[in-house]
Amino acid sequence: MDKKMLEAENAAGGVVAPVLEENAPFSPTRREIIAAFLLYIGAYIYMGGLKSWRLAVFVILFIALTELLNRGKPRSWESWIWLGCTTVITLSLLLERAAVWEDFSLLFLHIFAVWWALSRSGGLLAGESGHLLPFDAMNGFALFPFRNFFLRIKTVCYALKGPFRGKKKSKPETVVWTIGALAAAGLLFWLVLRLLADADKGFAELISHWLLDLDFRIDGEIWLKLLFSLPVGAWLFGLLAGSARAEKEKLRLRGRRINDALNRLGKVPNLVWTLLTALFCLLYLLFFVVQARYLFGAFTRSLPEGFIVSEYARQGFFELCKVMAANFVLLWLVTRLSAKPLRENRAETLLCVILLLESMLFAVIAFSKLMLYISCFGFTPRRLQSSWLVCVLFFGCLCAGYSLLCGKKSFRAWMIFGAVSLALLHLY
């Protein structure tokens, strides 16, 4: 590069024009080549259904290839947490203990596996989990896989072209089509051989000894699995290799730009949010006063008149949880859309803290109703799910309050608490 610049300077009489570097030719690493070929097997196993040995083999292969592609890179401590959650859910499915979440367990397994791959490769926008969760999820499930969707076929073509590199140049597409043609010709040869054997008994007896060794039935389901495993494998390789190849400085820069864009949303006067937050706080306070006997009956194990335990415990439980979720949305709007930082306005900060305390009271009320129900009728998977939801919402209120009062980030702690508790419930 320096030599080129010197030559350009001499030729231009001291005036240097920018010298653009040529794009480097595509050259995958040996690790990427190994991963590309192994994922053909992994994707086919995946299409066979993630049960019993298939699940174990696929997860082990996914973890091994992720580690292979990111070997030598620094590992964040939280990546161990996501790997642990992935392992716990896998074991629960293998041991058939995923009674609490049932069919949702596979969905959670996919989410944790993708998040672990992002964390292990350093592919999270901020370098760690946090409030950029929606954008990181978009990267993990869409941008990385689909931007690098054809990376595997390019890698495979590069590897197959290796023995001929340095000789007469041949396009990667030529290699692929040649292999495809050989496979098709072999299949047609076997088919014609079978047809000739069916047409003539003498010919059938002549070749029966070695035809028996080639006698296998072409199962349509197998070909369908092979066909659909191709895009699945391309998606998986795009995720793993794409996140490993991503330039981390560009990712961090993009994360900072998103943060800057979020900070520029603050256009609403703080007084407006102060009045609106005060309105919500007064509404909840009025609700607590008017409905005190009904809401707090579970604490004294005294039911309101006309109610039975099951009706009292279930009525309004999910509505209370939805109110808490609505409060989180309101809190996000206040913190993001206020013209001035929230912590510079004491009245608004105090009202947000009161709102969180009322949300925590909603969680305690919902949990008391649930515990009354469980004490009478015992545990069931759905009641455990409900208990988990209330605990996660309550912990979220604590984290939000900590951030408001101390100005420190706590979203990652909330994510980890929710993830670890969800994974551990699979062991019930």
PLM regions: where:
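Juxtamembrane membrane-water interface segments of multi-pass membrane proteins
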Residues: A11-I33, N70-E78, L124-E128, T155-V176, ...
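Alpha-helical transmembrane segments of multi-pass integral membrane proteins
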Residues: G140-T155, V176-D198, F228-A234, V272-R293, ...
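N-terminal signal-anchor module of multipass membrane proteins
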Residues: D2-L69
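Membrane-embedded alpha-helical segments in integral membrane proteins
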Residues: E32-M47, T87-L94, Q291, A366-L370
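Short aromatic-rich membrane-water interface segments that cap or initiate transmembrane helices
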Residues: L211-L227, E305-K322, F379-C391
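Short, highly charged, low-complexity non-transmembrane loops/tails of multi-pass membrane proteins
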Residues: G130-F146, R252-R257, W414-L425
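Transmembrane-helix bundle segments that line or gate the permeation/cavity pathway
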Residues: I45-W53, V57-E205, L224-E249
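Hydrophobic membrane-spanning alpha-helices of multi-pass integral membrane proteins
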Residues: L61-T66, W80-S92, A181-L191, C281, ...
